[in-house]
């Protein structure tokens, strides 16, 4: 398991490299997990006990960047887990979850391309 801090270091390097080549990086927050559903799938390793804290660390960093698409709320239940109806295995969003993510990306792009979100 990769710690949130390590992920942020890697994402920072990726962001900086993109910007050095004139590429505008756009971050999308990682999807939440549903440990209860993951445990039912025998071939997927259970997430670490502190997965929410590690994910929150990454999400907090992403939300501070110029361009971030936050999908957290749309995919999370009241406990901060991936909504059960959006992922059979508790890890990978199914069609409806992907539709929600796709719509968030489309909305962000439309806003960005029409000047509503300049990333500043």
Predicted regions and their residues:
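Solvent-exposed loop/turn segments at secondary-structure junctions
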Residues: 1-2, 31-35, 73-77, 91
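Substrate-gating cap/lid alpha-helix
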Residues: 11, 21, 32-73
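Structural beta-sheet core signal
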Residues: 27-29
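Histidine-centered active-site loop/cap adjacent to the catalytic His
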Residues: 56, 60-67, 84-120
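The substrate-binding groove and active-site-proximal loops of carbohydrate-active enzymes
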Residues: 1-6, 44-50, 89-92
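Short, flexible, mixed-charge acidic loops at enzyme active sites
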Residues: 76-84
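Hydrophobic positions in alpha-helices of CheY-like receiver
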Residues: 14-18
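A short helix->loop->beta-strand "cap" motif at the edges of active sites that frequently abuts
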Residues: 19-25
């Amino acid at each position: 398991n990769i710690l949130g801090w390590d992920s942020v270091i890697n994402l920072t390097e990726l962001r900086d490299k993109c910007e050095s080549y004139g590429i505008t990086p756009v971050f999308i927050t990682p999807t939440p997990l549903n440990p209860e559903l993951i445990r039912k799938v025998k071939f997927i390793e259970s997430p670490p006990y502190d997965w929410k804290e590690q994910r929150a660390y990454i999400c907090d960093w992403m939300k501070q960047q110029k361009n971030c698409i936050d999908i957290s709320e749309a995919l999370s239940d009241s406990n901060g887990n991936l909504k059960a109806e959006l992922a059979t295995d508790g890890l990978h969003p199914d069609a409806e979850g992907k539709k929600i993510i796709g719509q968030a990306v489309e909305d962000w792009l439309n806003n960005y391309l029409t000047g509503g979100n300049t990333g500043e």
